[in-house]
Amino acid sequence: MTASSSDACDPHAEARMASNAHLPAARMAEVVREYGPYPGAPAVHGVSHDGDRVWAATAAGLLAIDPASGEVQRTLPCAADAGTAFDGRHLYQIGDSQIQKIDPQSGRVVGTIPAPSGQGSDSGLTWAEGSLWVGQYRDRRIVQIDPETGAVRRTIESNRFVTGVTWVDGELWHGTWEGDESELRRVDPADGAVIERLALPANVGVSGLESDGAGLFYCGGGNSGKVRAVRRPKQA
């Protein structure tokens, strides 16, 4: 993911400010808890939630974290350099330009498909509506793919790097991280228009995003090695 830098040293900062001018005003995100860093896991590349545990993609593989205690309950060794997803039965993990389908009980890889970019720019990953949704940070887009074949079903464009993606209650959210600025954005799945923005504190990156299906988002924290729980806004 993108390394932190100040806007004074960022040649794209002015362009980002211009592209954000027509967007809804950002509100500050409410970070309610931080987890980690954990031994042997200096960076978090993706996150998911299986209804009970938070899964974090790290150099050590997938860590299953108890969200109440913050303790690591299990580690599944696998290539894990980007997004993570859960379909109710299997985990999906981006690693080495592939998406691995993993049995969380045994840790066995039961299938693989090519990651859509094939160039290491796939980042966020989530499961919804019978599809995998892949954030592509360099290409600034989200692609919906067939989980069996990897075929692209549709593409949603963004004006920012996409570093995490999740669906919750019919809402599509994605994480962004450019320079020292990170946000969580709710977007219209029909055309990608930004509906809502939550700004993370300066120098807090987002590398992976998932909802717990209730009141929280979980965000990977890149090279901080942390996972952060962020309050999900209540909708009217």
Model-derived regions, located:
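A short helix->beta-strand "capping" segment at the edge of beta-propeller domains
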Residues: 17-41
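Beta-rich, blade/repeat-based domains predominating
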Residues: 38-51, 78-88, 116-129, 159-170, ...
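Conserved beta-strand positions in repeat-built beta-propeller and related beta-rich domains
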Residues: 55-60, 91-97, 134-139, 174-179, ...
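WD40 beta-propeller blade core
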Residues: 63-64, 100, 143, 185, ...
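Short loop/turn segments that connect beta-strands within beta-propeller blades
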Residues: 66-70, 103-107, 146-150, 188-192, ...
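Blade-level signature of beta-propeller repeat domains, shared across WD40, Kelch, NHL, RCC1
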Residues: 206-236
